[in-house]
């Protein structure tokens, strides 16, 4: 999209608008689903390809890179998850790589893919006005994505709590912590419920806030004309740290929360 065709406000709003089908509760952000699924498939395909071709001989560069990531995640799980569960390491690896890939889309110049989608839709006859086509390519700048991820973690927290503590143990934790007295059961339940619900909320909002702010800065940089290339590069170098850190934080907090849920005390 060429910023000169629109006012600055229209340009920013267009880039922050999802390709949405439907209305209200049944609205679906098609671009979010498309890019998140595509990146998930890319992750599975690339890692499976390495696993199938891995050998005891001299590994290639990509195999070394994948093995380094797997070892890093595996060590993180061993240090943070105080228990034995075969699901945690694959789950942590999936969370880290998938979120990293979704975040990484933020480094693509903001006009490239939306412009291709805009004029592609126009030339194919899907729309009469190219500006009626919207395309957000960073799934983690959509609250639907971050809350879907965090609510999945929340469901696992409940499942692991019941699995390791039993229904009775989980209920006791919710009603007799932190004050071990029957008269304070309502207070305990409210406090524990808030603590429990704060976990997925903080996971979702932290990831969304950091990525949304980063995307907005890239959009503002794209509006400054000739100097946008060096400015984009400078911000991208810094943003790589944010991208990686947010994926790592989400992974580590997931491991810690599940470790706490599986702890008997």
From Swiss-Prot:
Mind telling me which InterPro entries this protein's record contains?
Answer: ATP_syn_F0_a_bact/chloroplast (IPR045082), ATP_synth_F0_asu (IPR000568), ATP_synth_F0_asu_AS (IPR023011), F0_ATP_A_sf (IPR035908)
Return one Gene Ontology term, BP aspect.
proton motive force-driven plasma membrane ATP synthesis
Q: Which cysteines are joined by disulfide bonds?
A: none
Where it sits in the cell: the answer is: Cell inner membrane
Q: Name one GO molecular function term.
A: proton-transporting ATP synthase activity, rotational mechanism
> Sorted alphabetically, which keywords does the UniProt record give?
ATP synthesis, Cell inner membrane, Cell membrane, CF(0), Hydrogen ion transport, Ion transport, Membrane, Transmembrane, Transmembrane helix, Transport
Q: How does it sit in the membrane?
A: Multi-pass membrane protein
By sequence similarity, the record places it as follows:
Belongs to the ATPase A chain family.
State the protein's purpose: Key component of the proton channel; it plays a direct role in the translocation of protons across the membrane.
Q: How does it assemble?
A: F-type ATPases have 2 components, CF(1) - the catalytic core - and CF(0) - the membrane proton channel. CF(1) has five subunits: alpha(3), beta(3), gamma(1), delta(1), epsilon(1). CF(0) has three main subunits: a(1), b(2) and c(9-12). The alpha and beta chains form an alternating ring which encloses part of the gamma chain. CF(1) is attached to CF(0) by a central stalk formed by the gamma and epsilon chains, while a peripheral stalk is formed by the delta and b chains.
| Identification of the protein by name | ATP synthase subunit a
UniProt source species: Idiomarina loihiensis (strain ATCC BAA-735 / DSM 15497 / L2-TR)
The organism's lineage is:
Bacteria, Pseudomonadati, Pseudomonadota, Gammaproteobacteria, Alteromonadales
Gene symbol of the encoding locus: atpB
């Amino acid at each position: 999209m060429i910023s000169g065709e629109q006012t600055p406000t229209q340009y920013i709003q267009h880039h922050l608008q999802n390709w949405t089908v439907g209305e209200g509760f049944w609205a679906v952000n098609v671009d979010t689903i498309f890019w998140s699924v595509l990146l998930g498939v890319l992750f599975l395909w690339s890692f499976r390809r390495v696993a199938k071709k891995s050998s005891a001989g001299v590994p290639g560069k990509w195999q070394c890179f994948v093995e380094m990531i797997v070892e890093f995640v595996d060590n993180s799980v061993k240090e943070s998850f105080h228990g034995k569960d075969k699901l945690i390491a694959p789950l942590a690896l999936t969370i880290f790589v998938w979120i990293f890939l979704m975040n990484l889309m933020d480094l693509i110049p903001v006009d490239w893919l939306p412009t291709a989608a805009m004029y592609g839709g126009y030339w194919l006859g899907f729309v009469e006005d190219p500006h009626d086509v919207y395309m957000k390519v960073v799934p983690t700048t959509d609250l639907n994505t971050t809350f879907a991820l965090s609510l999945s973690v929340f469901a696992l927290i409940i499942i692991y709590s019941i699995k390791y503590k039993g229904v009775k143990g989980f209920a006791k934790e919710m009603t007799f912590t932190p004050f071990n007295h029957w008269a304070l059961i309502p207070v305990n339940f409210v406090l524990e419920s808030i603590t429990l619900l704060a976990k997925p909320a903080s996971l979702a909002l932290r990831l969304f806030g950091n990525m949304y702010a980063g995307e907005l800065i890239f959009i503002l940089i794209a509006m400054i004309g000739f100097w946008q290339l060096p400015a984009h590069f400078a911000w991208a170098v810094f943003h790589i740290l944010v991208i990686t850190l947010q994926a790592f934080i989400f992974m580590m907090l997931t491991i810690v929360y599940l470790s706490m849920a599986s702890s008997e005390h």
